[in-house]
Amino acid sequence: MARAVGIDLGTTNSVVSVLEGGEPTVIANAEGARTTPSVVAFTKDGEVLVGETAKRQNVTNVDRTISSVKRHMGTDWTVGIDDKKYTSQELSARILGKLKRDAEQYLGDSVTDAVITVPAYFNDAERQATKEAGEIAGLNVLRIINEPTAAALAYGLDRGKEDELILVFDLGGGTFDVSLLEVGKDDDFSTIQVRSTAGDNRLGGDDWDQRIVDHLVKRFKESTGVDVSNDKIAKQRLKEAAEQAKKELSSSTSTSIQLPYLSLTENGPANLDETLTRAKFEELTNDLLERTRKPFEDVIREAGVSVGDVAHVVLVGGSTRMPAVVDLVKKLTGGKEPNKGVNPDEVVAVGAALQAGVLKGERKDVLLIDVTPLSLGIETKGGIMTKLIERNTAIPTKRSETFTTADDNQPSVAIQVFQGEREFTRDNKNLGTFELTGIAPAPRGIPQVEVTFDIDANGIVHVSAKDKGTGKEQSMTITGGSSLAKEDIERMVREAEEHAAEDKTRREQAEVRNNAEQLAYSIDKLIKENDDKLPEDVKSEVQGDVDGLKSALAGDDETAVKTAFDKLSASQTKLGEAIYAQGQQEQAAGEAPEGASEAKKDDEDIVDAEVVDEDDEDKKTDR
């Protein structure tokens, strides 16, 4: 019987795990190691190497060896080898293919299904690319799940019988995530629900390595006069030495870095011989460490809890072995000691294997509930961002809301989909636009267009719009629209906080304009429909106020709009009084029943006129 595995496809290393007898087991690769370097190399004789064998010949084959592919997922990045260009999906598929073969060798059975993990802040394009890589490798990707969630799944199932909050601090080779999860326990069942998540897709151990490389390049130039910053082979040697030095500084206070024959000078070979202390290393990388602080604070704030409510802190990713990282986490959590009972390199793959078991029916004692990291919505009149799904909403989820047209006989509506936290769409990320056509001719406010957002369990977005009158429907899948760099995500959240008051004022002004437009339209229509029932002086006064409001709306003075709106709101009551008075006069004159019927019809018109002043009706109509 074909088996299902859990795979942690990492920036630096990857791991595969499987359930045996309902319990997860990490599978050693063909070389005997439990982690496989995420490196692919193409030899000059046409052989493709993956893992440790590829990494070993990195220096001698630097132009044909590719590492840290994960940082390019979801982009149009390619690398040329001979006459062929390889995408990040193809190269990742090589790594996944090796993990698949190693698992099949260990199990003595075919492996067809897999749960693959991604950073919690991976966007739609990156998730789609990961799924495609699995398919290229011959795997049926059962689910894409977030790395911190997988780690909590692996950690939380064996921890007592009480409901607890678990904080996962995941600093890998290329990405950083922090998530707060709630583990709910019954006697024979566990629910793991993500409360909030935040992160940085461009922060990881590679950045710490690069700081050491930059430092060594500078020191080498100072001591020898040789600049090796553009020497590919020298840079690769420095990168490997930096990675090793970083690891050694996790257990030692200093390390010696010696690279003979790093370059050549007029006087012969130039050697590198440097001592790097932990204190210097932490000085070089302090700003990188500080970048982990804000996502941590955001997660605690958005979950509405205090640090003291956190029961367990789990460190995930090899980079969390750095003492400075451990110290910062302890400081942020009020002195709470991070759990050391899990292997930070393996825990994510173990959680993925557990989820694979759940999806295949091998484990029925756990339910996993994840979240979407950013709000999703559409643009409505006035450029307002109308959110249909708020950030940190549990997925899968589906939300619908009904909107209407802004103009008479409007034949179509353009549905513009946005992602972000600001009040106005111009400040958020445009994911895409599609058009719903074929709307039956009708006055503004009459057609009903239902917009539905659907986020599946993989975090991939689907949007549809349906005209309730004609049944016409249009839909789209966001496959690359939410490709947000970490700068975009950080900027959206930061600006949302900084400009909250400004956004509130602008939104209120937009709401007033919307309400004013609707009021002017409705009163204008009411005057025309009751022209013969209105005294000339009342009609002239109210029409003047309508014209004044229209004139104000044509300008940019928000105060003038509000003043004209208030004036018309007050004077419109005279229309109702006049129409009532006319109806009473007709009844007193003893008109025929037909006339009474007409008066009743007029009364119905009055009701229609009165409700336009209600805020909720205005907002709904103007969307």
Curated annotation (Swiss-Prot):
Region annotated Disordered, chain positions: 581-623
Lineage: superkingdom: Bacteria
Record bears the keyword Transmembrane: no
Gene3D superfamilies tied to this protein: 1.20.1270.10, 3.30.420.40, Actin, Chain A, domain 4, Substrate Binding Domain Of DNAk, Chain A, domain 1
Family annotation (InterPro entries): ATPase_NBD (IPR043129), Chaperone_DnaK (IPR012725), Heat_shock_70_CS (IPR018181), HSP70_C_sf (IPR029048), HSP70_peptide-bd_sf (IPR029047), Hsp_70_fam (IPR013126)
Record's compositionally biased regions (Acidic residues): 604-617
Keywords for the protein's UniProt record, in alphabetical order: ATP-binding, Chaperone, Nucleotide-binding, Phosphoprotein, Stress response
Residues with Phosphothreonine modification: 175
Induction: By stress conditions e.g. heat shock.
Biased composition (Low complexity): 581-596
GO function terms (MF aspect): ATP binding; ATP-dependent protein folding chaperone; unfolded protein binding
Family as reported in the entry's similarity comment: Belongs to the heat shock protein 70 family.
Function: Acts as a chaperone.
Record's protein name: Chaperone protein DnaK
